[in-house]
């Protein structure tokens, strides 16, 4: 049987980090087994579902590179199908109409709680076979088995057993004519041939209810894999403040999509002690059965380390468009400075994110207007005009502007003055960047461009008073 998985977000908000991990595991499992991955949008919550959220989910999936074979399929476009299946259950005596008011339902729950019983629907309409009538309280309830046990072998959690006596007759169609979650997902997964349902363990309590509906329909029951939640760095439930942010905020924070994929894959799954995986390695090695049953903790330092690894090892040309995105966010005209790929080469050993890289790179895209006063006092003092002047002379004479030629010119300047390279590099670094800290001096000067470098040296000479 062909493996078919699905990711089924509810568009009531953006795709957060937990949802992204679920999507990734569903995608990896399908790809690993040579199957198909389906995207379904569970948008039947009409009050909370928005097109903005749908667009954000699709954008995040695209950014992460999680392509799907079918979809997006929208539940709101399948209402007639849900009605058809509900009517089938009604005709077979496996579901029934109920018309209790909100006050009557509240009274049932209060009576149960007074007896120290689980608050639940008491089955008042179960055997009445009430006909359809136009009523604002009309619902359709599923006849849950009264006896027996629901047993399933979760691919992550192991064997789980729930007594049917713990379950009541849940609503499968609401008064507004829309199906409930537990009913719609069963019909969807049945129609779509889903063989493995991979989702968060907050859905475990829904699973026995859903299995009973599958069996009532005579539908094949898929395998289930319930992943533990992701905790924050203190071991508490994730919040927006502690990492449960929109996935695209990770893009804005300067993380590479494949670095986030690598990190999320390891957030609950492992292959020995290996930390870094190419996409092909993930596809070859991933098996949902190997997902840890214990909750994983978000570790932003680890994510930063993984991201820096890919900044250091990826082709700079592939990183360049993402650096340009960060620069534009800062209001930078990327055409007004060096090629982004060259900036990546210069800075990738010094930063963990593209956001940091862009912030450090601004100095090469805008006129230098501010200087670190301590750096000026230390390195642009009287006497610094000599190495700066010689460096300017050598740089101005270059026929071709390249890192290698800039390096040769600066070393020639130091040799001509019989100075150590540091005596040339430090005043030049302050002249070019306004600070004492920058990448290799040859790269620092090269990235300023010939005209920009000479102009900044001239400004520094004026500052020294020796123009």
UniProtKB/Swiss-Prot annotation:
What is the reaction catalyzed?
Answer: tRNA(Glu) + L-glutamate + ATP = L-glutamyl-tRNA(Glu) + AMP + diphosphate
Residue sites binding ATP per the record? 240
Indicate which residues form the motif 'KMSKS' region: 237-241
Keywords for the protein's UniProt record, in alphabetical order: Aminoacyl-tRNA synthetase, ATP-binding, Cytoplasm, Ligase, Nucleotide-binding, Protein biosynthesis
Q: Where is this motif: 'HIGH' region?
A: 9-19
Q: Name one GO biological process term.
A: glutamyl-tRNA aminoacylation
> Which subcellular locations apply to this protein?
Cytoplasm
> InterPro entries attached here?
aa-tRNA-synth_I_cd-bd, aa-tRNA-synth_I_codon-bd_sub2, aa-tRNA-synth_I_CS, aa_tRNA-synth_I_cd-bd_sf, Glu-tRNA-ligase_bac/mito, Glu/Gln-tRNA-synth, Glu/Gln-tRNA-synth_Ib_cat-dom, GluQ/Sye
Q: Which GO terms describe its cellular component?
A: cytosol
User: What job does the chain carry out?
Assistant: Catalyzes the attachment of glutamate to tRNA(Glu) in a two-step reaction: glutamate is first activated by ATP to form Glu-AMP and then transferred to the acceptor end of tRNA(Glu).
Q: Which HAMAP family match?
A: Glu_tRNA_synth_type1 (MF_00022)
Q: Which family does it belong to?
A: Belongs to the class-I aminoacyl-tRNA synthetase family. Glutamate--tRNA ligase type 1 subfamily.
Name of protein: Glutamate--tRNA ligase
Source species, please?
A: Xanthomonas campestris pv. campestris (strain ATCC 33913 / DSM 3586 / NCPPB 528 / LMG 568 / P 25)
Question: Which gene produces this protein?
Answer: gltX
